[in-house]
Amino acid sequence: MKLKRYFIVWIGVSLMLLTVLLTLFTTMADDGMVWDYQFLFEQVVKHFVTMIFPMCITLISGYMISREYTDDTLKNIETLPISFRKLLAGKLIVSAILSLFLGIVCFVFTVIANFIMGYDGFALIPALTGLVQMALLGFFLYLTMLPIIVLTSRYKGSFLVGVIVAFVYGFIGMFANGTLQSIYPVSAALGLINYRAGAEGVMWNKGLCFISILIMCAIAVSYTHLRAHETAAN
C-alpha cells in the first residue's frame, strides 16, 4: 500500500509526541498548580487543538492528495476505471481514519507521560472516556480543516500554504470564548466531545457546535465537486 511509504505519517506520530512533550514542558512553571491525570489530559487537549493537530492533519492530508500532482500520476487516472472524484474521496477517507488514529496515539503518549511523571488520579473509566474523546476530537478537527485541505492541495507544493493557514486557524481558537467558542469551528470540536463541560466559564451550545462543523464539511464537499468537474474538463 502506498501509504506505507509515506514517511509523513511518522511525522504525524512524532507531532503527537511533541504535543505531550510541550505540555510537560509547561509543568516546569512554578505556578503552584498541582498536576494530576485529568489536568494533564486537559492541557494536552489544549495544545492538541490550538497548536499541533490542525497543521499536522493538514500536512498529512495535503501531502497525500498533492502526490498525484507532484508524481505526475494524475494523467494516468484516465486509463483507470475510477474518477478523480472517487480518488479524492478515497484519500479524504484515509485521512479521516488517520485523524482517529493520531488522536489515539496522542492519548497513548499522554497515559505514558502520566505514569512517567507519577501523577495521581488515573482510573480506568476516565481513561476510556479520554481515549474516545481524543479520537473523536482528532476526527472533528479534521472535518474543520477539510476546506483548507481541499483548497490548498490543488497545485504542486501549495498544501504547505495550507499548513500555515491551519496553524493560524487553530491558534485563533485559543481565544474563542462565550458563544463564539461554540461557533468557531476549531473550538466547536471541543464542544462536541464535551471538553471540560461544567467547568467555570465553559458552556457549550451543542447545536451551534454541530452546525459549525457541518458548514465546514459542506464547503469542502462543494469544492471537491468543483475540483472534480475542473479535472474532468481538462
Residue positions per predicted region:
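Hydrophobic core of alpha-helical transmembrane segments in multi-pass integral membrane proteins
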Residues: 15-24, 107, 210-223
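Long, hydrophobic alpha-helical segments
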Residues: 45-67
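Secretory targeting signals
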Residues: 20-53, 89-154
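Conserved small/polar residues in nucleotide/adenosyl-binding loops
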Residues: 224-231
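Transmembrane helix segments
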Residues: 22-25, 151, 155-191
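Helix-loop-helix units of permease transmembrane domains in multi-pass membrane transporters
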Residues: 64-96
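Aromatic- and glycine-rich beta-strand/loop motifs that create alpha-glucan
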Residues: 1-13, 154-157
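Short, membrane-exposed interhelical loops at transmembrane-helix boundaries
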Residues: 185-203
